[in-house]
Amino acid sequence: GHIRGAVAFPLDWLTTIDGPEVARLLAEKGLTADREIVAYGTGAGDAAAFADRLVELGLPTVRTFDAGFGAWAADSTLPVDKLVRHDRLVHVDWLAQVLAGERPEAAPSGPFLLFHVNFGVPEEYAENHIPGALYLDTNWLENPADWNRRSPEELDRAVRALGITRDTTVVVYGRDTEGDANEKWPGRRAGQIAATRALMILRYAGVEDVRLLDGGYDWWVRAGHPLETFQREPTPVGSFGAAIPVRPDVIVDLDEAKAILADPEGAALVSVRTWREHLGNVSGYNYIGPAGRIAGDVWGNCGSDAYHMQHYRNIDNTMRAYPEITANWAEAGITADKWVAFYCGTGWRASETWFYAYLQGWERVAVYDGGWFEWSQDPINNPIEIGEPLDESAA
C-alpha cells in the first residue's frame, strides 16, 4: 500500500539511471522545483537518501516523513490506498524468501510452482533461470494456427502435464531481451508479456492463485539473487480438479466483442496497440496483413511496438504505478463500472493489461482472444476503421 495521493518513485531510479532520463522521470511524476516535496519510505534511511539526492538534482524544498509508511498505516484514521489483489503481483525479495523456505506475508498455503515462461525458447531456460523454476512454453497453452487459447481438452492435458491443479499457487515470470520487431519470431524476446499471457490462460482454466513476478527475470538478476542451470522436469498430476474453463468470462470471443461494441455507454473494447497500428499505418505483425482498427474501439496504448509495453511499465520493467494506469484509462472512458475487454493482435498485450485491471479488483474484465488477427479476416462482417479517429479520447 501507500499513503493516499503519494507518487511512486523508487530510490533506485535516482542512483542507477542517467541524468537526462532521471530529469524526464521527475518531471513526468510532477516532482519539480516549484513544489514542496515530502519523501517517505519504509524507514527514515531511504527517505533521507532520496531527499538528499533530490536536493543535489536542484529540487530545493524536500522534507522527509521519517516515521515511514509503517507508522502511517498503523493509524486506521489515516488514508491508505493499495491494490485490491496486491498479493498477485510479487516482489523478487518475497519470492527469494519463499524459495528459502520462509513464510512472508501471503506465502503459498499449499502446493507451489514457479515457471520460467517464453514462446518456444527452451534453450533460454536451459542457459539459466531462477532456482526451482520449471519451463513453460506458451505453445502448450496456445494454438499455433491463430495464437488463441487451446481447447479445454488440450488445456486440461497441458496443465496436468505441468503438475498444475486448481489449488496450486503458480508464480510466472519471463525474460525480456533486445531484438528487432521485424525478425521472424520477435515474441520470443518478450518473455514478461508471455508470462502474463500464460497467467491469463491459467486463470481462465481455473487456477485459483496465479501470480506474476514483478519485473521478471531481469529484476531478479538486478536485485542480486542467484540463478541456476539445473533443468527440472514437472511431476504430472492425474486431475486438474475441475472442468476447464472454470472462468470462461476471462476471455470473450467474436460475438461478445460485438456485444461490447454495441454498448458504448456500458462497455469498452480497448485496443492495446501502438498509435501506428491504431491509425492503420502498420498491422504490427509479420504474420498479419491487414492494417487498421476495430470500428468503435477505444485506444489503450501499449508501447513502441507489438512486443513492448512501456506505457504500462516503469523504466525498470516493473508494473507502472496503478493510479497512473487507472487515470490514463479514465481519461479514455475505460472504467471499472463497465464491461471491459482488451484486445491486441492475438492476445499477448491484452493479457498484460487485463492483469493490471484484475489486480485492481475489476470484476467484469476480459481479453478478446481473437483480436485484430481474427477481426481483420472478415472486413465485410467486421467493420474496420483507419486514419485519425473522430473521438480523440485515449489512454
Listing of model-derived features with the role each one plays in the protein:
Residues 1-395:
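Cytosolic catalytic domains that perform sulfur/thiol-centered chemistry
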